[in-house]
Amino acid sequence: MSRTIYCTFLKREAEGQDFQFYPGELGKRIYDNISKEAWTQWQTKQTMLINEKKISMMNVADRKVLEQEMINFLFEGQDVHIQGYTPPSE
């Protein structure tokens, strides 16, 4: 059964995560406040960051950079900037 949360990213009620998949306090914050829809949007941005900035998930410093970008995107309203990327026009 799905659960509904108030998503702080989308600023509305939405379907919450099924379980806490990110560790620690940040993981609890994501589980409590970020919807599946918002998380999917982050995953798209994350993939772009990993590819364009050649981030290695084996490198602790790179993981910290990615985590900070995630916090900025999901909780602080800062969009991910990829140099040279132009989003498709609607």
From Swiss-Prot:
GO terms for biological process: cellular response to oxidative stress. Transmembrane segments: none annotated. Belongs to the Fe(2+)-trafficking protein family. SUPFAM superfamilies: YggX-like. Gene3D superfamilies: Fe(II) trafficking protein YggX. This is Probable Fe(2+)-trafficking protein. The lineage of its organism: Bacteria, Pseudomonadati, Pseudomonadota, Gammaproteobacteria, Enterobacterales. GO terms for molecular function: iron ion binding. PANTHER family: FE(2+)-TRAFFICKING PROTEIN-RELATED (PTHR36965:SF1). Keywords: Iron. One of its GO terms (cellular component) is cytosol. Monomer. The keyword Ubl conjugation does not apply. Could be a mediator in iron transactions between iron acquisition and iron-requiring processes, such as synthesis and/or repair of Fe-S clusters in biosynthetic enzymes. NCBIfam families: PRK05408.1.
